[in-house]
Structure formats: structure tokens, C-alpha cells
Regions:
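Helical cap/lid subdomain of alpha/beta-hydrolase-fold lipid enzymes
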Residues: 209-421
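Residue-level detector of intrinsically disordered terminal segments
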Residues: 12, 16-17, 342
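Bacterial signal peptide processing site
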Residues: 24-26
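N-terminal non-catalytic accessory region
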Residues: 88-241, 384-403, 407-421
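Mature extracellular/luminal domains of secreted and GPI-anchored eukaryotic proteins, especially small
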Residues: 28-96
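Short, solvent-exposed loop/turn elements at domain surfaces
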Residues: 41-46, 123-128, 228, 304-310
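Bacterial N-terminal signal peptides that target proteins for export
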Residues: 1-13
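C-terminal motif of bacterial Sec signal peptides marking the signal peptidase cleavage site
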Residues: 20-22
Length: 421
């Protein structure tokens, strides 16, 4: 929903923003970064991740400086876009710079079986499926869509039984014999564990097909099937910088009462994070084999700190996003925005960790493209880990790429329908 601003107020706001930017005294770049960061914290009323001055363009720094001062700051209070992108703010708050969607409009081809959306490790507001995703899938695509909200910060061994209970409820409610699962982040591992012969069926001592026969397909989005180094660092298993700082950054991202004490002392949190480590992934994948009769497919997300382009990164992106049938896998990228997704500021501290210090490695801030592949790889979407769920504070269409996440989900379901699922 776009905020309504009187034209005269808009003129005054823009005049103040331009005037403040033009009159700013010369200062060292590092000092300016620190000042802008402090202003953003005060303006938005919530902490922003630290700005990487070396990776922030002068133009973006100018925009952030302008948006954190005077009347513009007042307009941002309480409604600032969660990604920190000045272009997103201009579109959502002022109606300036908005772009048309390049994501194809969904066809109204309902799936044969209901679609169940499965959440990731967290259920805080930033990590919930946007209501617009559900409404677009239902209204534009004609799909029956329901949610499976699993306990946050638990392992697949705990969450898969919850998912099975929800599937049984949906089957009873709809009369459908099977469901299609679309699973984000850790939810992808839960979905795989649910139907694997060595997963929930083995835990309960029942026939492997008991759970698998109730699931028609598993589509994972942004799932770290081969682990994410962010989890290794949070658990102190990888020597990347200051462990305490990384934990605090994750607390800012999750919006939860995180602390070094909680991660060190809460066995549930540690177990959930351990499932996502690079160290634990090989054993999980070797044990949790795919179930017969279930379609497995995956999508990866990618984004760039401050939307910055890089020839080395883009070359890797083109290579890694190639789909199983040899297509580019980047169909959602070329469009009106002409650039990369602006990674949410809260994710920026983790992008370098996820990529093991290699800036050319494509990731969504938490999961690399390579780690997100499982089953039939469908390609990459220009969305960071949070934007893959939609964010109520962002424009419906990404201003830099033209990507529409709600249409994307509706099209994923439409593709399942075309496969008879």
C-alpha cells in the first residue's frame, strides 16, 4: 500500500532533501558512513546493519544520507522499507521510480492438489510469507493455498511431525489425497525429511510410503541443501571474525532475543543451526534420500550488497543458474530495472560469510546458489533471503529488477498444475 503525500508536502520534502545533500560539509568517507548509519538507526527507529563503506557507492551513500534527514526522515519513521534501498523507499513512500513487473502474469490453471507453504527457521515478521503471495496464488492462479507454520529454531526431526499433522489436516479439510509442498529455507530440509524412507517414517517405524504417498511434489526456495557457512560461524565452528559480532548481527536480522548466551546455552537453537551447517550437510544428504513418486525441484535466490554489479560475480551467476535442461535460468532478471537486487542491509554482514570471503560467489545473503540446488533445478530469482517471502514494506515489484515475488509463486504453482500436480 502506497503512502499518500500531498503534492505541496512532497515538493517541500524533495527541496529539503536536495538542499541538505548539497550543503553537507566535506568529511572523510568512513566518518560519513558512520554518521549516515547512526542517522538511519534514529530515523527508522530500528537498528540497521553496519554499512560496508568500501562497497557502498557514493550515489547510494548520497541517497541514504538524504533519506535519513529532515522531513524525509519523518516520512520514513515506522514505514521504512526493510531492505534499506533508497529506490524502494522512493517508490513506496513517494511513488517515484516504480517499475512494471517483468514476471509473467499467472495463468489461471489450478493445481490438482492443494499447495502448502512451509516456513523456514524463523517465524518473525520478516520471515513470514506475505499475504500478497497467498492472495495472488489464489485469486490470479486459482490455487488452493494453505500455510504450515512450524516451530521456529527446531530441527527437521521436530518440525517434520508438525508438518505431517498439518498435511493430515489439509487432506481431511479438502478431501485431496496429496499435497504440493513449497518450502522456504530450513523448511526445505523439513519437507525432505518428512517423505524420506530414512526420515519420519523410520522414526515412527512405519512403511516409507506412508508419508511419501501424501506428497505430490516438493519445491524448495532458498534452501541450503549443502549448508550455509553462516550457521557454522554462529556456532563457532568456522573462524570468521568476531563471533559475538556475528551473533549480534543475526539478532538484528531475526528480530529475536538472540545473544551469545542463548546460542551457547539453548540446545534447540544449536541443534537447528547445526542442521544448516556445511559440516552437517553431507551426512544429512547421505541419509535423507529422496522418496519414490515425489517430484523434487528447487529455486535459488541471489542478491548483491547495495545492488553492486561485478563481472566476476555475474559470470559465476550465469554458470550456476543454468537449469537442468540447459536454459539460462535467469529469465526473471533481464528487465526494466536493469540491475541487481539491493540486498537487505540486515543481510549484508552475512553475504561475505556465506560466500567464504569470495565476492564472486552468488548468494541470497544466507544460502549460496550452489547450495540451494536439489532435484530438478529451475533457476535463480533476483531476491535476497527475505524478499523470497515478500515483504509488506517493499514495493510489489522490485524497482531494480522488475521481479514480482507474488507472481513468481503463482507461476511455480501453475507449473505444477501443467505437470498434472
Amino acid at each position: 500500500m502506497r503512502a499518500l503525500i500531498h503534492p505541496q508536502s512532497l515538493s517541500v520534502m524533495l527541496f529539503v532533501m536536495i538542499s541538505l545533500g548539497a550543503c553537507a560539509p566535506t568529511e572523510a568517507r568512513e566518518d560519513r558512513c558512520a554518521r549516515v548509519e547512526s542517522q538511519l538507526d534514529a530515523c527508522a527507529g530500528t537498528p540497521f546493519a553496519r554499512l560496508d563503506c568500501s562497497a557502498t557507492s557514493t550515489a547510494d551513500l548520497d541517497h541514504l544520507d538524504d533519506l535519513s534527514q529532515g522531513i524525509a526522515c519523518q516520512a520514513l519513521q515506522g514505514v521504512a522499507p526493510t531492505d534499506g534501498d533508497p529506490m524502494s523507499a522512493a517508490c513506496r513512500l513517494l511513488g517515484i521510480g516504480c517499475v512494471a513487473s517483468i514476471t509473467p502474469a499467472p495463468k489461471r490453471t489450478p493445481t490438482r492438489y492443494p499447495v502448502l507453504l512451509v516456513n523456514g527457521i524463523d517465524t518473525s515478521p520478516l520471515f513470514r510469507y506475505s499475504p500478497r503471495i497467498v492472495s495472488t496464488m489464489h485469486e490470479a492462479g486459482g490455487h488452493r493455498v494453505l500455510l504450515a507454520t512450524l516451530t521456529p529454531y527446531e530441527t527437521p526431526q521436530v518440525r517434520a511431525p508438525e508438518l505431517w499433522k498439518r498435511i493430515e489436516e489439509v487432506r481431511k479439510e479438502t478431501g485431496a489425497p496429496r499435497v504440493n509442498l513449497i518450502c522456504h529455507s530450513l523448511g526445505g530440509l523439513d519437507c525432505r525429511y518428512l517423505v524420506s524412507p530414512n526420515g519420519l517414517a523410520a522414526d515412527r517405524g512405519v512403511a516409507p510410503e506412508t508419508m511419501a504417498s501424501a506428497v505430490a511434489s516438493i519445491t524448495t526456495i532458498g534452501t541450503a541443501h549443502r549448508g550455509t557457512r553462516v550457521a557454522d560461524v554462529l556456532l563457532g565452528l568456522a573462524p570468521d571474525g568476531d563471533h559475538g559480532r556475528v551473533v549480534n548481527d543475526f539478532a538484528t536480522l531475526a528480530g529475536d532475543a538472540f545473544s551469545a548466551h542463548r546460542i551457547d546455552g539453548d540446545v534447540h537453537v544449536r541443534a537447528a543451526l547445526r542442521t544448516l551447517t556445511v559440516a552437517a550437510a553431507p551426512a544429512f544428504n547421505a541419509s535423507i534420500t529422496d522418496a519414490d513418486g515425489v517430484l523434487y525441484q528447487s529455486w535459488a535466490g541471489y542478491s548483491r550488497p547495495f545492488g553492486a554489479a561485478s563481472a566476476a560475480h555475474d559470470a559465476q551467476l550465469a554458470k550456476l543458474c543454468t537449469t537442468a535442461d540447459g536454459a539460462t535460468g535467469l529469465a526473471y532478471v533481464a528487465g526494466s530495472g536493469g540491475g541487481h537486487d539491493f540486498m537487505a542491509l540486515a543481510l549484508v554482514p552475512f553475504a561475505n560469510i556465506a560466500a567464504a570471503g569470495d565476492a564472486s560467489v552468488p548468494s541470497d545473503g544466507l544460502a549460496t546458489v550452489a547450495s540451494a540446488k536439489w532435484g530438478t533445478f529451475k533457476g535463480c530469482v533476483p531476491a535476497d533471503h527475505m524478499e523470497q517471502l515478500g515483504q509488506h514494506s517493499l514495493p510489489d515489484v522490485n524497482v531494480r529488477t522488475g521481479f514480482d515475488v507474488a507472481r513468481f509463486y503463482a507461476n511455480v504453482a501453475g507449473d505444477l498444475a501443467e505437470q498434472g500436480l
